[in-house]
Design a protein with these regions (language model features):
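Nucleotide-activated donor-dependent transferases that construct or modify glycoconjugates
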Residues: 1-9, 16
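Conserved nucleotide-sugar phosphate-binding/catalytic loop shared by glycosyltransferases and other
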Residues: 4-7, 24-74, 215, 298-300
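Short amphipathic alpha-helix
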Residues: 12-23
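Active-site-proximal region of nucleotide-activated glycan assembly enzymes
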Residues: 29, 50-52, 111-167
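Donor-nucleotide binding loops and adjacent catalytic segments primarily
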Residues: 38-49, 168-248, 282-285, 290, ...
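An amphipathic, basic-hydrophobic alpha-helix
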Residues: 65-94
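Acidic donor-binding loop of glycosyltransferase active sites
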Residues: 92-94, 244-259, 266
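A short, well-ordered alpha-helix in the C-terminal region of glycosyltransferases
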Residues: 315-327
Length: 343
């Protein structure tokens, strides 16, 4: 039995799902430990492939200050003591953390129970919790080669659902554009899509738009007032079907988006969320930009958007993705864990 912990947002949860799928292929039973907050329950409350699912009252600590931060940390320790009992009950051999605030209780519980902790870091800048726990982990997995610094750190292909690879194709010309604000939506990207919708209509370019639940009504009303037919949705677990129809993406640059779009050979204009911790979304996108595999549009350069669209080397970038070998990162993590004699 292994435990998978972490989440909060879609990027972390997508990795958790990949690990679950790989574990089931290899005959490993899994439990999941996440949070009542964030999107953990939306993704996994009905996921029967897990032997058991636990959702705790955990929340973030990093953005809190003073006594509030101390109180939140003490609450995590209290939760960790309860999780320690859960790990012992299920005779868990290893705890895999995919990051996010909901991974904290189970990660600390693993250390308390002397159960091997294995961490996946999804971003180009290591998160605060992962940075704290890294020295105590048995293995630290990353898809960013500049994070390799110690013997327990392993370069690992980014865990993505294999369907992104299976449905990959070279984009030849811009017929459809998809706006992706992430699993929670992004008002800036929504506004950018609405502002330029008439331009795309005039050019005969179809719009696919993930706008998030909180902004759905506003976006729907705006498109209707412009009499523009658009594939508008708030959230879709099977988003690959939307992505596979698109020829160009406009997206935040969370790590999962970065690698999923790359695996699908879908060129992208990344708009990093400027308030992300350690500005990690910008550095995620920069990792691809330095390899001529994307364009970056910062929010203060909004007026450059159409120029970037008109001069975007669509076919060239899409073709370059063929040079990248796509392997199953979740399979690699489990293989390495077995090689280390942990499971």
């Amino acid at each position: 039995m292994i435990a998978i912990t972490g989440g909060g947002t879609g990027g972390h949860l997508a990795i958790a799902r990949c690990l679950l799928q790989s574990a089931k292929k290899q005959g490993l039973e899994c439990i999941y430990i996440g949070s009542e907050n964030g999107q953990d329950k939306l993704w996994f409350e009905q996921e029967l492939a897990f032997h058991q699912r636990y959702f705790l009252s955990s929340s973030g600590v990093v953005n809190k200050k003073g006594l509030s931060k101390i109180s939140s940390f003490m609450h995590i320790i209290k939760l960790a003591l309860n999780v320690k009992k859960i790990l012992k009950k299920h005779e868990v051999k290893a705890v895999f953390s995919v990051g996010g605030y909901s991974s904290a209780p189970a990660s600390f519980a693993a250390l308390m129970a002397n159960i091997p902790l294995l961490i996946h870091e999804q971003n180009s800048k290591i998160g605060s919790l992962n940075l704290l726990l890294k020295p105590f982990s048995k293995a630290f997995f990353t898809a960013f080669d500049d994070q390799i610094d110690k013997k327990n750190t392993f370069f690992c292909p980014y865990p993505i659902n294999e369907v992104f690879i299976q449905k990959a194709r070279i984009r030849q010309e811009l017929k459809s554009i998809i706006f992706l604000g992430g699993s929670q939506g992004a008002k800036f990207i929504n506004d950018l899509a609405l502002k330029n919708a008439l331009y795309f209509k005039e050019k005969g370019i179809n719009i696919i738009h993930q706008c998030g639940k909180s902004d759905y009504k506003r976006c729907k009303s705006a498109y209707e007032s412009m009499q523009i037919k658009v594939d508008l949705f708030d959230f879709d677990k099977n988003i690959i079907e939307k992505i596979s129809k698109a020829d160009l993406a406009v997206s935040r640059s969370g790590a999962s988006s970065l690698f999923e779009l790359s695996a699908n050979k879908l060129p992208c204009i990344f708009i990093p969320y400027p308030y992300a911790a350690k500005n990690h979304q910008y550095f995620n996108a920069l990792y691809l930009k330095e390899r001529n595999l994307c364009e970056i549009l910062t929010q203060d350069r909004e007026n450059d958007f159409i120029d970037i669209i008109n001069n975007f080397p669509l076919k060239q970038i899409s073709s370059r993705f063929c040079e990248i070998e796509n392997k199953n990162g979740a399979d690699f993590m489990l293989y390495k864990t077995k090689e280390l004699g942990i499971i």
